């Protein structure tokens, strides 16, 4: 069974043919995803992708097995202060982000990110995070691409 492909890469191209045709997103690693024009998020995605392409920042993209984009989120540089502690439960690990008013969370389905987050606590180097806005769940994390100057928010 095919699974959703998740990529966190810089944008190399966004094609918007206009009319009622779907757009196409191209990422640095060669991934291409269809941007469904009928999707109510289409115009928001175009703005996110345009800004990311200009800045060189990676984006978080989840594509269905057929290649259609399901989720596109901007990534932001953040400094991780603590992994675990207050707010941690059996289902999710609390993550304290510098200057964030709320606790963020890492769930079991993204547990593989924990070592990267813990390393960032030790080094105090910023990570690029993709966060689900409604739940504050950390969906993706990576180190900034080589040569990209990032300022944590």
Model-derived features: where do they sit?
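Short, flexible, surface-exposed loop segments at domain boundaries
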Residues: 1-153
């Amino acid at each position: 069974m095919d699974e959703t492909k998740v990529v966190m890469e810089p944008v190399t191209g966004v094609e918007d043919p206009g009319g009622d045709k779907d757009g196409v997103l191209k990422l640095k690693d060669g991934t291409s995803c269809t941007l469904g024009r009928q999707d109510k998020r289409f115009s928001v995605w175009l703005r996110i992708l345009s800004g990311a392409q200009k800045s060189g920042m990676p984006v978080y993209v989840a594509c269905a097995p057929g290649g259609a984009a399901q989720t596109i989120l901007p990534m932001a540089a953040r400094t991780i202060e603590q992994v675990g502690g207050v707010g941690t439960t059996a289902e999710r690990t609390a993550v304290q982000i510098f200057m964030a008013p709320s606790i963020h969370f890492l769930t079991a389905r993204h547990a593989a990110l924990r070592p990267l987050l813990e390393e960032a606590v030790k080094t105090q180097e910023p990570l690029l995070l993709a966060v689900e806005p409604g739940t504050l769940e950390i969906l993706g994390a990576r180190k900034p691409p080589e040569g990209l100057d990032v300022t944590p928010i």
